[in-house]
């Protein structure tokens, strides 16, 4: 029904879903209601809805479609399905998520191992012990490192385990019992595994006591290096477990949601408590979300938890949810309890979630917010750029050149869409030629969504070059912006930045406090960080290839680097030092000494 023909008299007072569309019949927003007439009436009454984003939404709405359903549950499910189908701009829409990390022990193998997996990889058909989830990948891998140091279980794949004929380097480092070649009995291995399981369950007292005894024994035997290694392990255990202890929650499994809005941006923070331990926080960012707070929370909970293999017994929300059927829809057999506590430990956890959401907004953006209005007021753009790509490159005197682009969309940076381009060394002598190579390869295939804006680290020359390439490729609707430091122009010791764009092809400057300037600087810094990291990785691979010596395999190379720390030190080592490395044959040492002569000549 078109807006000019819209009449509340034609809308039923029934549960249902409504779709707001623009002049091109594109769905802008999808909402649900217990009473369609009352809900839609609030959009047309001056005092019906005080949210500042509603007038903005109504200006773009050309028609409204309604779908009547039988009850609230059907409305909730239909809304969720339609959001996934139409991807409306002003609704919460969670991207494909990698979910949390867990530690898993497969019980189907005769010699189980501990490994990190994503929660979406957990299936009921597998016999597994699951620990977690851990919101932070760092926390998960810290625990893996502790287990590797103190509980020498295998870490190899099942295929590698079956094919191995002799123990790997981890056995020499005392990080594996080498069950692959029968160096331990099943009882010995199971005893070590049981200790690891106790540790992961949080029962670290016995492990700590054992470690303290071993440290004391090593010290008494004057084995100070070994004692120091054990002490570092003990510190790592206490640090990893101490971060998670929260006695207030009495071993409960709880998720708490914090909601923070600032102008056109919304932050939703999810705090996870498992077995009474606060595991961390995850943040979700949405731009121009037009949903009411209760609707946003309901939509998020439904989208997020239906894809999770584990749902906590309790989900805390900052507001009581309108639809009591939500809990039932999530899990009909054992539905989670949804509540909004006003006092007690639950309220403290909700306050913590809110503070985390607010802090995340402050640390991920300039002081006020993203420069949505500045794109119109300063750059004179007719609409906000929803997809921005920022380009940069990195090389070392022309070698190992790498071009990249990063992607910024409504929800912030999207690393899954970042791309890397390896550049021929002939084209790295000219920075503009390198830029052209990257852009041509980027737009050679149009299977990836086109950007609304391209940002390049450079000045007027880079702006003209980028603009020319875009025009040559017949690409329309793409804004080009370049940003560069002004040469020989300092203000209070700081370089000024100059921005070039279609409105200001000769460039213009903004004060350092400008949100627009800070936004472009954030984009440029992220692209530069990504380019440098990929360049270093490429250079590292090249150095690795140089280190390859006939007869010196991966295991021997690791032993050499473990002893000498760098390949340069290997090339400077003596014959006596090489002979002390376990596993090196006389032939290996002769090959290394011959390579040392070539190395010293080139040096």
Swiss-Prot record:
InterPro entries for this protein: GIY-YIG_endonuc, GIY-YIG_endonuc_sf, GIY-YIG_UvrC_Cho, RuvA_2-like, UVR_dom, UVR_dom_sf, UvrABC_protein_C, UvrC
Pfam families (alphabetical): GIY-YIG, UvrC_RNaseH, UvrC_RNaseH_dom
Cellular compartment(s): Cytoplasm
Domain UVR: 205-240
Sequence ranges assigned to domain GIY-YIG in this UniProt record: 13-92
Disulfide bonds: none
A GO molecular-function annotation: excinuclease ABC activity
One GO biological process term: nucleotide-excision repair
Xref: Gene3D superfamilies: 5' to 3' exonuclease, C-terminal subdomain, GIY-YIG endonuclease, UvrC, RNAse H endonuclease domain
Assembly with partners or alone: Interacts with UvrB in an incision complex.
Function description: The UvrABC repair system catalyzes the recognition and processing of DNA lesions. UvrC both incises the 5' and 3' sides of the lesion. The N-terminal half is responsible for the 3' incision and the C-terminal half is responsible for the 5' incision.
NCBIfam families from the UniProt entry: uvrC (TIGR00194)
UniProt name for this protein: UvrABC system protein C
Source organism of this protein record: Chlamydia pneumoniae
């Amino acid at each position: 029904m078109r807006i000019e023909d819209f009449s509340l008299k034609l809308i039923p007072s029934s549960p249902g879903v409504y779709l707001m569309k623009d002049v091109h019949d594109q769905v802008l927003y999808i909402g649900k209601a217990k009473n369609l007439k009352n809900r839609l009436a609030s959009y047309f009454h001056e005092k019906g809805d005080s949210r500042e984003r509603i007038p903005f939404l109504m200006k773009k709405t050309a028609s409204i479609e309604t779908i009547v359903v039988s009850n609230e549950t059907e409305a909730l499910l239909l809304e969720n399905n339609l959001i996934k189908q139409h991807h409306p701009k002003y609704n919460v829409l969670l991207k494909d998520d990698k979910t949390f990390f867990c530690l898993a022990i497969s019980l189907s193998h005769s010699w189980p191992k501990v490994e990190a997996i994503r929660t979406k990889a957990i299936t009921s058909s597998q016999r597994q012990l699951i620990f977690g989830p851990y919101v932070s990948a760092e926390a998960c891998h810290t625990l893996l490192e502790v287990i590797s140091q103190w509980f020498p279980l295998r870490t190899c794949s099942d295929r590698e385990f079956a094919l191995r004929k002799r123990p790997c380097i981890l056995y020499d480092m005392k990080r594996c019992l080498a069950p692959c070649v029968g160096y331990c009995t099943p009882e010995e291995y199971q005893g070590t595994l049981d200790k690891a399981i106790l540790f992961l369950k949080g029962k670290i007292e016995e492990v700590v006591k054992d470690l303290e005894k071993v440290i004391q024994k090593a010290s008494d035997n004057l084995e100070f290096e070994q004692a120091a290694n054990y002490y570092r392990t003990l510190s790592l255990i206490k640090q990893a477990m101490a971060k998670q202890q929260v006695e207030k929650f009495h071993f409960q499994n709880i998720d708490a949601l914090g909601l923070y809005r600032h102008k056109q941006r919304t932050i939703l923070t999810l705090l996870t408590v498992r077995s009474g331990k606060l595991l961390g926080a995850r943040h979700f960012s949405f731009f121009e979300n037009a949903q009411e707070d209760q609707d946003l929370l309901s939509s998020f909970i439904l989208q997020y938890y239906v894809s999770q293999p584990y749902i906590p017994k309790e989900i805390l929300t900052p507001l009581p949810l309108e639809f009591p059927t939500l809990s039932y829809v999530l899990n009909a057999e054992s539905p989670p309890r949804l509540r909004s506590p006003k006092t007690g430990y639950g309220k403290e956890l909700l306050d913590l979630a809110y503070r985390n959401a607010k802090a995340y907004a402050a640390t991920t953006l300039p002081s006020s917010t993203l420069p949505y209005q500045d794109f119109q007021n300063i750059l004179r753009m007719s609409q906000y750029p929803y997809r921005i790509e920022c380009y940069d490159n990195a090389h070392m005197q022309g070698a190992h050149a790498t071009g990249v682009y990063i992607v910024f969309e409504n929800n912030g940076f999207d690393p899954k869409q970042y791309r890397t381009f390896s550049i021929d060394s002939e084209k790295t002598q000219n920075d503009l030629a390198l830029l052209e190579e990257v852009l041509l390869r980027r737009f050679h295939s149009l299977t990836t969504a086109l950007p609304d804006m391209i940002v390049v680290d450079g000045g007027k020359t880079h702006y003209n070059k980028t603009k020319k390439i875009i025009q040559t490729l017949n690409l329309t609707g793409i804004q080009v912006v370049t940003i560069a430091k002004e040469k020989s122009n300092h203000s209070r010791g700081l370089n000024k930045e100059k921005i070039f764009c279609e409105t200001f092809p000769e460039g213009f400057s903004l004060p350092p406090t400008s949100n627009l300037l800070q936004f472009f600087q954030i984009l440029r810094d992220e692209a530069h960080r990504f380019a440098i990291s990929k360049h270093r990785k490429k250079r590292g691979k090249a150095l690795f290839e140089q280190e390859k010596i006939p007869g010196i395999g991966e295991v021997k190379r690791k032993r050499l680097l473990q002893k000498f720390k760098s390949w340069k030190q290997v090339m400077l080592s003596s014959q006596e030092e090489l002979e002390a490395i376990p596993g090196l044959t006389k032939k290996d040492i002769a090959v290394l000494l011959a390579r040392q002569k070539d190395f010293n000549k080139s040096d």
